[in-house]
């Protein structure tokens, strides 16, 4: 059963690399994950940000999506990156596994983002005055089958080979478990995220019953449309 579940996750998560069609067979390549497609819209992304931070931003134009081109940056791929009010940079990744290298990947990703931002702002880091940069936040939304805590903090310093020396650099990645019963304040604060979790849960449930991924997706999509979970998105993409 565990191996079967892992195969489901592998098929579902393969959508992060390939073109997306809700009723494509599992072998068909996908371009973007469902998650990326949903939260590539500023309105939905702002709702997610507000839920994660208990904030109340209302204007989607306060947000600027700055996700790097995956074709150029495959090793540091992130689902979505954005600026809020130009002074905070948020990296969000959705995953069915918890990768202990998230902090290192985030460090490299942030460095590239800062390089782009400084170039766009025509900043010179060799000048005497302090160059200000957006404050970073790195978040992973986890909904895999492995039991994990509600909240985990992964640290870059755990990767340092010499643990006896106090490091001059640190980076934290917050991992939020969004499975049923976990972080309900976040899910209740963002209906779209909650609907997405329901969709994935239904696909898993259906796959366990019928053993066919394409049919499992089809059945889950029909259910979610009827129940008004991601209805507009699913109708557009079915």
Over which residues does each language-model region extend?
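Elongated, amphipathic alpha-helical interaction scaffolds
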Residues: 2-238
